[in-house]
Amino acid sequence: MAGIGPITQDWEPVVIRKRAPNAAAKRDEKTVNAARRSGADIETVRKFNAGSNKAASSGTSLNTKKLDDDTENLSHDRVPTELKKAIMQARGEKKLTQSQLAHLINEKPQVIQEYESGKAIPNQQILSKLERALGAKLRGKK
């Protein structure tokens, strides 16, 4: 095979398994700039309501209207005066401070302060702990 002259091919190179660019690749900034330089037509379209879930938030206006129309008083029950006095009296008989009582029932001293000032929302679990620690009936009929 002693050839004469340079070796040349008479066919075009074929690339196997090269995929066409997908939509994401066409939106790439580099691709768009290349298309602008070559003078190709570029269409830019903004999606309507993209990224803002308007469909989900539009239903809240009905609920807001219902809440505005509702006149009922929405508040939690607080500790009744009799219970406040009973806790203070039982604690006084046992000669315990608020922090000592709180330590006995594994609660924070602030919880006892809230119960004795009437700001707490009654919790049956805490009330039963108080009854056991103080040895007095705080709930129900005496």
From Swiss-Prot:
It is found in: Nucleus, Nucleolus. Residues 98-117 bind DNA. Residues 50-64 have a biased composition (Polar residues). The keyword Zinc does not apply. Keywords: Activator, DNA-binding, Nucleus, Transcription, Transcription regulation. SUPFAM superfamilies: lambda repressor-like DNA-binding domains. InterPro entries: Cro/C1-type_HTH (IPR001387), Lambda_DNA-bd_dom_sf (IPR010982), MBF1_N (IPR013729). One of its GO terms (biological process) is positive regulation of DNA-templated transcription. Residues 87-141 form the HTH cro/C1-type domain. One of its GO terms (cellular component) is cytosol. Its main location: nucleus. Gene3D superfamilies: lambda repressor-like DNA-binding domains. Expressed in leaves, roots, stems, petioles and shoots. Higher expression in flowers and siliques. Detected in leaf veins through development. It comes from the Eukaryota. Residues 49-75 are annotated as: Disordered. Belongs to the MBF1 family. This is Multiprotein-bridging factor 1b.
